[in-house]
Amino acid sequence: MTSTHDTPLALLGYPQGTGRALRDLGLTAVSVPEGPLLEVLHACTALAFQGALVAANLQAGMLAVTQPDSAAQRAGSADVLAFVAGRAAHATCTLPDALLDALEDSGYPVRGARALLIGQGGDLGAGLALTRLGLGSLTLAAASHPEAEALARGLPASLKAHVTSRSDPALVTLAERADLIVLTAGPLPPGVLQPFHALLDLTGRAGGAASRAGSALVPLTRLPELRLARRLHHATGQRFAPDVLKELAGVLG
């Protein structure tokens, strides 16, 4: 019987040689061509690849050539695939669940928090995962008001929610009603952060703004390895301890 260790893992969009970094986990990983995507995925299925890790530059194109789950659809992208013979590859985006893992790890009390989510498009999908932790209220600031309204349609009916755009002049006033600011994409609008806020920064670029405003920064230091653990589980069915994936997460992004 063939074990999962004998079945190759595809690396889609990663440079040749990246697979060497996975050998210590007992995985055989092979970089495959980037396209045409549908032909590459059919070949992976025919060659009995168990799954694929998808590099960031190809993740948005996965939805058109796979069977995306609800997480991938909300995010507008997929970072990992699982292959099933005779069927389209099953695609998901692991960032939302990994974010919840990281928040639990940080100890930040999300339940009951009044959150302001700032971002655009699928990037806001990861932040919307916070609604599963019992937010007290949510203000959703997307690239435009119609985009925010579209994203809000999937929110729990019981959640007190308000939608706006990130360019709304009233955003600073709306931020004063929040205690948690979540930035999922783009720059932080001027004047939003106050000393009483906690900032959850998914862009990794707003730490300086938090420091200048005197705001607390919710630590997400283990997010990369927590996310990689979920990606590997989806692609291979195997569970790996996040602590052993820290260096590898830096390679695979």
Features from the language model and the residues they span:
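Phosphate/diphosphate ligand-binding glycine-rich loop within oxidoreductases
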Residues: T2-Y108, A206-A209
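Structural motif
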Residues: L11-Q16, V32-G35, V54-L58, I118-G121, ...
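Glycine-rich adenosine-cofactor-binding loop
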Residues: L12-G13, C93-P96, L103-A148
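Short beta-strand elements in bilobed, periplasmic/extracellular small-molecule ligand-binding domains
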Residues: L22-P33, S137-T139, L159-T164
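Adenosine-phosphate binding glycine-rich loop
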Residues: G26-T28, L200-G253
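Conserved S-adenosyl-L-methionine
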Residues: R132-L138, A157-L159, S215-A216
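Short, conserved SAM-binding/catalytic segment
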Residues: A150-K160
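Rossmann-like adenosine-cofactor binding region
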Residues: L159-L223
